[in-house]
């Protein structure tokens, strides 16, 4: 008995290996059906996004200044196997890619800086001023924002509307009195971001959980931009979204850096790190193991730094 299977995915490698035919939809519309054997990955992507992609990443037209926007020195977690003795800086208008293997403690380090995790030592300066960030509220007040890696668990407020999700982090600026919110300001904020970021949503009242992953991510970025942060930490900003939406997110990141925002981008996709970073910071086992200029970054030199594990005491003794 032969059975036909429908397999839904936006991972091109899976489609090429598993499928005989590929049916492509875009914005709720049927685009067409093709034999997988006769289509390259690039051709499938072009059909998905409705245009040819000459490059997977937009050109980086930002020019990082000499001004240090944030400096971190000797940042160490209270947990002995987490991040330790981490020091780095990011300049105004720079995209700093953060690379590393699973367990490198990249997310944990950034959550610590944002006030979500406790640390035993370390200092942080924003625009030359030493700051004491003990909780996320402190970070937000010092113009730092964090887009978390799991948008469903710690990002979107699923049962709330798109308008609520965009405005939730900037309610103080959206009040028209000590208690009441200014609905016109909120709707103007939503309309501005909908146009600027090409967010596909029927109405500001639409529940965010009904949107695609890419549109949810744009809403979360819009949420933080409403506070006009100087430093924007993006943890896996394109995880779980389709290739068309990825390119749109990349364009947003590139434009923010061009405007002078300092972007820290954690990514597990090596090509994303190489394609979207002015400079790459590599971590291994809780430590920063090196920095690479963006134009010099390759998979090989990133992996060399990402695998610089400290020798365990027992192993060191055995080798003597």
Each predicted region: which residue ranges?
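Glycine-rich phosphate-binding loops of nucleotide-dependent enzymes
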Residues: 3-320
């Amino acid at each position: 008995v032969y059975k036909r299977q429908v397999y839904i995915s936006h991972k091109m490698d899976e489609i090429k290996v598993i499928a005989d035919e590929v049916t492509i939809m875009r914005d709720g519309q049927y685009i067409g059906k093709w034999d997988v054997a006769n289509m390259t990955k690039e051709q499938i992507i072009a059909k998905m996004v409705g245009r040819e992609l000459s490059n997977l990443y937009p050109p980086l037209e930002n020019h990082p200044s000499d001004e240090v926007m944030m400096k971190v020195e000797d940042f160490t977690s209270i947990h002995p196997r987490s991040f330790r003795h981490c020091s780095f800086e990011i300049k105004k208008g720079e995209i700093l890619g953060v690379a590393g293997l699973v367990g490198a403690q990249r997310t944990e380090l950034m959550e610590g800086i944002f006030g979500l995790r406790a640390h035993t030592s370390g200092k942080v300066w924003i625009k030359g001023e030493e700051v004491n960030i003990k909780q996320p509220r402190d970070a937000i007040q010092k113009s730092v924002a964090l887009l978390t890696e799991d948008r469903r668990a710690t990002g979107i407020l699923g049962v709330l509307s798109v308008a609520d999700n965009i405005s939730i982090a900037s309610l103080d600026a959206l009040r028209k009195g000590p208690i009441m919110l200014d609905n016109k300001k909120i709707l103007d904020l939503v309309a501005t971001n909908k146009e600027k970021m090409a967010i596909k949503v029927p109405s500001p009242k639409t529940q965010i959980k009904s949107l695609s992953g890419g549109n949810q991510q744009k809403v979360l970025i819009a949420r933080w931009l409403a506070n006009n942060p100087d430093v924007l930490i993006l943890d896996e900003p394109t995880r779980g979204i389709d290739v068309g939406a990825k390119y749109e997110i990349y364009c947003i990141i590139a434009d923010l850096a061009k405007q002078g925002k300092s972007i820290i981008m954690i990514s597990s996709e090596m090509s994303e790190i190489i394609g979207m970073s002015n400079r790459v910071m590599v971590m291994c086992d809780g430590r920063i193991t090196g920095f690479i200029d963006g134009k010099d970054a390759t998979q090989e030199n990133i992996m060399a730094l990402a695998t610089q594990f400290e020798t365990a005491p027992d192993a060191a003794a055995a080798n003597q």
